[in-house]
């Protein structure tokens, strides 16, 4: 009897060890594939401008640059809205702050925004920290309304601030490159900002700080009773979120060669960040990236078929509404919950 028991115990131990080994191997495979895919995608996009040697692909570069800007902004918004659970519709303010700060340095002192973008991000983060100290005392609908009020105040201020051009805006000098290569510096800069933002979001999510953010998004009172300084965590998340948006705004301003409040300080810019995260999967790493790609692609499709009017916005909205009926947690979130997420999109 004892021999049988020992044999059974030994067999169980072997089976358990084998199962543990298989799980470790599976996790390692997932991690390898999840690392391989975004790096391969980044390398492919970095090589894309080589197409300019065989033809004019400026529009393709513009689309990638535009998408990369929203990847950066949506991933940045995800730090506050996805991890901490605070939905802000005022993040276009930091897009404008970054654009105007670096744009003014370029217009008056000739310093390229490619150099001053990190500084613009820090200015946006400092303003975000100050704003967060005030607005993050409330949450839910009250916080959303306060973020919209912030955007409205900023729009009035920028429209009437003659030092930065007022409502007429400010024209920025173009670079000295030929038309074929003029987009190249901004293309690589925005690609780098997008990659850095996604990587930072991943690091934040898997840090002690990120764990605290996710805890307070579930139950802020319980998180505070567990010893988490919820006010600091929220304000820090707000500042970090503003930092990356400010950098994207800095590069976008010089790329356009002009700054106007009706371009930067639009609620549509903030809404796009939110919608991209929701469509892709709020709180995930790959979600904002997938959401940005899908919404930009849908918008371009509807503009091409329906023209540049509000109808294309309606079309994009309808597709999103239908999509969320089938993917209530976003594309990445729903597939991950059901265990059907492709390994190449498992970036979490």
Task: Give the label of every model feature segment.
Residues 2-348:
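Transmembrane alpha-helices and adjacent helix-loop boundaries
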């Amino acid at each position: 009897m004892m021999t049988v028991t020992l044999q059974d115990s030994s067999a169980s131990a072997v089976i358990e060890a084998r199962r543990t080994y298989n799980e470790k191997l599976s996790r390692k495979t997932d991690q390898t594939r999840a690392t391989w895919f975004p790096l391969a995608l980044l390398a492919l996009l970095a090589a894309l401008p080589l197409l300019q040697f065989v033809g004019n692909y400026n529009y393709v570069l513009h689309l990638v640059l535009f998408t990369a800007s929203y990847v950066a902004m949506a991933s940045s918004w995800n730090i506050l809205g996805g991890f901490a659970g605070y939905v802000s519709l005022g993040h276009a303010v930091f897009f404008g702050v970054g654009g105007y700060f670096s744009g003014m340095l370029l217009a008056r002192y000739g310093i390229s925004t490619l150099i001053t973008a990190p500084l613009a991000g820090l200015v946006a983060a400092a303003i975000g920290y100050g704003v967060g100290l005030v607005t993050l005392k409330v949450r839910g609908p009250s916080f959303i309304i306060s973020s919209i009020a912030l955007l409205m105040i900023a729009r009035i201020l920028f429209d009437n601030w003659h030092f930065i051009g007022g409502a007429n805006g400010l024209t920025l000098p173009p670079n000295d490159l030929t038309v074929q290569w003029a987009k190249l510096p901004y293309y690589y800069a925005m690609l780098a900002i997008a990659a850095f933002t996604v990587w930072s979001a991943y690091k934040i999510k898997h840090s002690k700080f990120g764990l605290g953010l996710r805890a307070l998004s579930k139950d802020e009172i319980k998180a505070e009773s567990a010893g988490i300084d919820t006010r600091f965590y929220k304000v820090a998340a707000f500042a970090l979120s503003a930092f990356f948006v400010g950098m994207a705004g800095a590069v976008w301003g010089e790329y356009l060669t002009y700054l106007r409040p009706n371009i930067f300080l639009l609620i549509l810019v903030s809404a796009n960040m939110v919608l991209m995260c929701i469509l892709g999967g709020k709180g995930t790493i790959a979600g904002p990236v997938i959401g940005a790609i899908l919404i930009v692609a849908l918008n371009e499709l509807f503009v091409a078929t329906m023209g540049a009017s509000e109808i294309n916005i309606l079309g994009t909205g309808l597709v999103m509404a239908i999509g969320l009926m089938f993917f209530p947690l976003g594309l990445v979130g729903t597939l991950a919950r059901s265990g059907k997420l492709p390994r190449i999109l498992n970036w979490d």
